[in-house]
From Swiss-Prot:
CDD domains associated with the record: trimeric_dUTPase
Species: Acidobacterium capsulatum (strain ATCC 51196 / DSM 11244 / BCRC 80197 / JCM 7670 / NBRC 15755 / NCIMB 13165 / 161)
Record protein name field: dCTP deaminase
UniProt GO MF annotations: dCTP deaminase activity; nucleotide binding
Catalytic activity field: dCTP + H2O + H(+) = dUTP + NH4(+)
Family: Belongs to the dCTP deaminase family.
Involved pathway(s): Pyrimidine metabolism; dUMP biosynthesis; dUMP from dCTP (dUTP route): step 1/2
PANTHER family: DCTP DEAMINASE
Binding positions for dCTP per the UniProt entry: K106, S107, T108, Y109, A110, R111, T130, L131, E132, Q151, Y165, Q175
Amino acid sequence: MSIKSDRWIREQALKGMIEPFSEKQVREGVISYGLSSYGYDLRVSNEFKIFTNVNSAIIDPKNFDERSFVTVEADSVIVPPNSFALARSIEYFRIPRDVLTICVGKSTYARCGIIVNVTPFEPEWEGYVTLEISNTTPLPAKVYANEGLCQILFFQGDEPCEISYADKKGKYQNQQGIVLPKL
């Protein structure tokens, strides 16, 4: 299994792996996004779900209460101290059968105590990415829409997998927006 370069990512993007695709890394006046040497910095859209405790809900992944969130559409969002938000990528991904991705947070946000978690994109997964954003600080933290949030690294297996995410009809296949926990 090897990490894939900018050349490979560009070739695959032209075949529809990433839409829309920014062929160059955009850095001027924004938190960077677009193609990098060995990855792709995705952008966060302007759709956010911020955790709130207004309804005194308990977070239960088997019985998730949507009232645990406040939905926000904005150019930026404030994540409360020691809190959490969900968002989605601007980019839509179609992962090849012999590829697995890993997502890592951007250092600009990490240095401010904002941690991004995204599970791997499995072979033949497709959709908009639901992004998990944690504010680990005791202060409110700002996240900017339409700018970079995390970097996707692409790894190609030595051979295609036997059973892909599409084959097993994964529950998060073809996500069209922010998708909450499912069983």
